[in-house]
């Protein structure tokens, strides 16, 4: 894992699937924004900290997904790191049963099997309306960016660098993705649009870029959500069940996996888009003996 300078006292660690921002409080103490994936990033993150003589005094979590909170509890135990999280994400992170709220397609048993490493107890809670956080002797800006998850936040370093978590992804990720991860699509679109007024010397996207201009990426991320919703509608034949509809979409998009976690993410994401299409009046749900059937509107 490499350490790359971004701006001022802000750096990023180049983890396996994401960038982990690191803000230097001094030559030794640092604050991390997220911690990577337990299985893939723990040894690399530990080696990076040890080799550079860095002590993780604190971590601020953008949201409770396994590729972001995988090493929070580990850092708390090994280094005495303090962890802060937004109130919704902090609640989700307390144990595998709660963590399932972000992975609802998994059974409780499977959630307990998979997510023991990802769970942690936050040392402090970030309110849902907070715009700043006094932490480890510094003031960090807080951007409330719900949508990707219910309590997703961005963080602004004291030197002005904006970490946007998963609110935006880079163009390479868009080009490779089959279906966006978004819990509440309408809120996600609002959060993405709100970034048009944000000004910073650098912007860090967890997946997986550092940029100085967001304009094109905001447009392409919004277009990606709208494009995928249109493709989903194209796959809907009136009267389909959820199973029929997702099968048709995944067959068209060549989404194939036998990995239960990956499948659960696809199922969850698809279901979130279906809910949005219903909420926006483009799809109607009809129930017969408690079974849902979907119909296009107009």
Feature locations, PLM:
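Metallo-beta-lactamase
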Residues: 37-38, 139-146, 150-226
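Active-site HxH/HxHxD metal-binding segment of metal-dependent hydrolases
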Residues: 37-132
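Glycine-rich phosphate-binding loop signature in dinucleotide/nucleotide-binding domains
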Residues: 51-54, 135-138, 197-199
């Amino acid at each position: 894992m490499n350490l790359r300078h971004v701006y001022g006292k802000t750096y990023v660690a180049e983890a396996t699937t994401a960038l982990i921002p690191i803000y230097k409080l001094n030559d030794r103490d640092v604050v991390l924004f997220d911690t990577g994936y337990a299985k893939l990033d723990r040894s690399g993150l530990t080696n990076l900290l040890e080799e550079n003589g860095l002590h993780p005094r604190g971590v601020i979590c953008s949201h409770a997904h396994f590729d972001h909170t995988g090493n929070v509890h580990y850092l708390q135990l090994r280094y005495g790191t303090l962890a802060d999280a937004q109130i919704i994400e902090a609640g989700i992170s307390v144990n595998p049963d709660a963590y399932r709220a972000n992975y609802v397609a998994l059974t409780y048993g499977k959630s307990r099997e998979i997510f023991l490493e990802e769970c942690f107890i936050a040392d402090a809670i970030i309110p849902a309306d907070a715009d700043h956080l006094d932490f480890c002797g510094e003031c960090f800006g807080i951007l409330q960016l719900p949508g990707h998850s219910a309590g997703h936040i961005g963080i602004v370093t004291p030197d002005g660098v904006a970490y946007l978590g998963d609110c935006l992804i880079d163009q390479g990720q868009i080009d490779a993705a089959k279906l966006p991860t978004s819990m509440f699509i309408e809120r996600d679109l609002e959060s993405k649009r709100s970034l048009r007024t944000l000004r910073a010397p650098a912007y860090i996207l967890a997946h997986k870029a550092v940029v100085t201009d967001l304009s094109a990426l905001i447009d392409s991320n919004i277009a990606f959500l709208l494009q995928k919703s249109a493709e989903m509608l194209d796959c809907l034949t009136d009267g389909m069940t959820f199973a029929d509809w997702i099968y048709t979409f995944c067959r068209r998009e060549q989404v194939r996996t036998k990995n239960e976690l990956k499948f659960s993410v696809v199922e969850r994401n698809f279901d979130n888009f279906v809910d949005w299409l219903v909420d926006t009046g483009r799809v109607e749900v009809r129930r017969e003996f408690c079974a849902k059937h979907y119909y296009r509107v107009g």
